[in-house]
């Protein structure tokens, strides 16, 4: 498994660039994210757009926190992304285990996009 760590201080522009990098990788692509926070009134809009952008790149998506990732999920669904390729967990520590369970014949490239601030509560 190969990891792309974009977990610090994610924003809409940086997340889009990280997805472009992930898209260049030859194997199965996984996006692991709790979504972007602290974006003010536009937070839901940006996260939905992020979900739409993820749908064009990722073979699998692991969402951390059902409530805060709903806009991302909605963006994925707007693009008719396969629900069977979406995993939702409330425990960020489980994401590494979940990514490793996805191993198949191809290499796995996992983009870790954003990390929630310590003070964030769903």
Residue ranges: model-predicted function:
Residues 1-122:
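ATP-dependent carboxylate-amine ligase
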């Amino acid at each position: 498994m190969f990891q792309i760590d974009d977990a610090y201080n994610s924003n809409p522009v940086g997340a889009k660039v990280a997805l472009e990098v992930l898209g260049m990788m030859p194997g199965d692509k996984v996006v692991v994210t709790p979504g972007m926070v602290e974006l003010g009134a536009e937070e839901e809009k940006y996260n939905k757009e992020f979900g739409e952008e993820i749908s064009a790149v990722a073979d699998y998506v692991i969402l951390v926190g059902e409530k805060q990732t709903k806009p991302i999920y909605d963006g994925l669904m707007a693009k008719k992304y396969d629900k069977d390729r979406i995993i939702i967990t409330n425990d960020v520590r489980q994401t590494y285990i979940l990514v490793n369970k996805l191993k198949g014949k191809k290499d796995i490239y996992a983009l870790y996009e954003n990390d929630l601030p310590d003070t964030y509560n769903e």
